[in-house]
């Protein structure tokens, strides 16, 4: 373990998440690269960070699954230290289609990954960051989308609705934990 600040970036094996993980590492954070399926991509990001002198681990966890989220945070606690920053970035998007063509399985998968996953990760971060639980505070960033405001008709309103829920989660949680030295933003 080290004395660096610790950042967990969910869904950071590629794209925005990978770039965010590298940015935090460049700024001196010990980083957890979280991934669901693509171990080789996540490990490549982690190795790049380590090759640049950073501290990084890659941890597989499906953020829509409560046990996986608990294991993710416990692993970070033991290998890097207590989380200082959580970036909720993991999310899924499916083929564009109209609502009448969407199955309940599709809608539930989007909501489990994009909403429940953020709730679970926020919960575990707050347990560790909150001054009410002996923490020193921290930062939670929930990655949202402009689709939350446009609704994305004829494309993916299920995804848009999930991001609207994230905006509401962020607003409510930011007020709930502000006095505990935790900042929450989109």
Identify the residue ranges that each predicted region occupies:
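Active-site loop of short-chain dehydrogenase/reductase
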Residues: 4-5, 54-55, 82-83, 129-144, ...
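Conserved mid-core segment of classical short-chain dehydrogenase/reductases
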Residues: 70, 93-108, 127, 131, ...
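Amphipathic alpha-helical dimer-interface segment in Rossmann-like NAD(P)H-dependent oxidoreductases
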Residues: 113-135, 174-175, 179
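Catalytic loop of short-chain dehydrogenase/reductase
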Residues: 93, 135, 141-165, 170-179
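Conserved glycine-rich cofactor-binding loop
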Residues: 13-14
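Catalytic Tyr-X3-Lys loop
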Residues: 84, 100-119, 141, 159, ...
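Conserved glycine-rich Rossmann-like NAD(P)H-binding loop of the short-chain dehydrogenase/reductase
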Residues: 27-44
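The beta1-alpha1 cofactor-binding region of Rossmann-like NAD(H)/NADP(H)-dependent oxidoreductases
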Residues: 39-40, 60-72, 104
């Amino acid at each position: 373990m080290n004395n660096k600040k610790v950042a967990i970036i969910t869904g950071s094996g590629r794209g925005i998440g990978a770039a965010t993980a590298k940015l935090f590492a460049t700024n001196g954070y010990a980083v957890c690269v979280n991934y669901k399926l693509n171990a080789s991509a996540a490990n490549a990001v982690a190795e790049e960070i380590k090759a640049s002198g950073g501290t990084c681990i890659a941890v597989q966890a499906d953020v829509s699954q409560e046990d996986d989220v608990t294991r993710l945070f416990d692993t970070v606690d033991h290998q890097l230290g207590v989380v200082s920053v959580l970036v909720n970035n993991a999310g899924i998007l499916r083929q564009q289609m109209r609502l009448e063509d969407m199955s309940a399985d599709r809608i539930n998968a989007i909501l489990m990954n994009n909403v429940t996953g953020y709730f679970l990760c926020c919960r575990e971060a707050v347990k560790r960051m909150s001054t009410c639980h002996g923490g020193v505070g921290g930062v939670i960033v929930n990655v949202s989308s402009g689709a939350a405001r446009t609704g994305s008709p004829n494309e993916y309103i299920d995804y848009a609705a999930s991001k609207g829920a994230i905006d509401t989660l962020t607003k409510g949680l930011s007020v709930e934990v502000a006095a505990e030295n935790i900042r929450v933003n989109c």
